[in-house]
Amino acid sequence: LHVRSRRQRQMCIRDRFIDVAEGRLSLDDFMAQLSDDDLIHLLGGQPNVGVSNTFGFGNLPDYGVPSIMTADGPAGLRISGECSMNTTAWPCATLLACTWNPALVQQVGQAGAEEVKENNLAVWLTPAVNIHRNPLCGRNFEYYSEDPLIAGKMGAAMVKGIQSQHIAASVKHFAANNKETNRKHSDSRVSERALREIYLKGFEIIVKEAQPWTIMSSYNAINGHRASENRELLEDVLRGEWGFKGMVTTDWWTRAEHYKEIKAGNDVKMGTGFPERVKKAMEMGQLGRPELEHCARRVLELILKID
């Protein structure tokens, strides 16, 4: 009888997130039952499932929160090499920009998202909209242009196409990530004017025109302050000035401190979080439950959007 009663209680708990999705329970009431450990768990990346090779997030099975798997782009869907699945190699971003045709790019985004969904994935880590600052950048082919207007318009079209299929687009790498050499440790020194008119402008256009569900912060520092720990960038500019309502993830395996990223409004640390460090920060009074709740809410809101 004791085992049956416990199992019944667990089944009731697992149904709770479904109740939120179906309108029988508020997200506030759902989150009120989560422990600090549960919230911290939501703020770190989760192991690969299925064909994914870029990890995921969510994954609170006792509460019915699913694992939401990601897949890399941008020139087509990249999945685990161990899977015997074929995917489409779409033209790279630079070539798509050469069409000067946002409607066509939107169609590519839609078709790509359909393929993402067919493979039981939910977040496509594209578009990449960094600026062609130097022709020697090793990932220029992933970026649209040296012109932030073209990058923004093409990126917005891609996001609209992807999200029309209820798949989340992840706009990256925010911001001033314009080289590959030593990018986990580099510091992009840039004036306020150049930052806003060149390196942020494409992201601003995408946020205002396409409302992306996720944005990926970059490894690099900007004027001495790591992008993933930069509250001015993530809260004041991205959310405050531009009106971004979605979730922010780090780039994979950042060297930044997890609790500082949470304080800055960087919601999920990918590929995995550092829960013990976050707990230690809470014990030392450097981080509070309200900050965990702000980030976890955005994670759960994103999961509710995905079909």
PLM features per residue range, with description:
Residues 2-9, 13:
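Single conserved hydrophobic/aromatic residue that forms the stacking wall/gate
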Residues 27-30, 42-43, 108, 295:
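A structural signal for short hydrophobic/aromatic patches embedded in well-ordered alpha helices
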Residues 38-188:
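Long, structured ligand/cofactor-binding scaffold of large enzymes
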Residues 2, 32, 98-109, 192, ...:
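Short acidic-aromatic active-site loops that bind/stabilize oxyanions
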Residues 15-30, 54, 93-103, 140-148, ...:
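Second-shell loop/turn segments in exported
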Residues 32, 36-39, 44-51, 113-121, ...:
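Sec-exported extracytoplasmic/periplasmic mature domains
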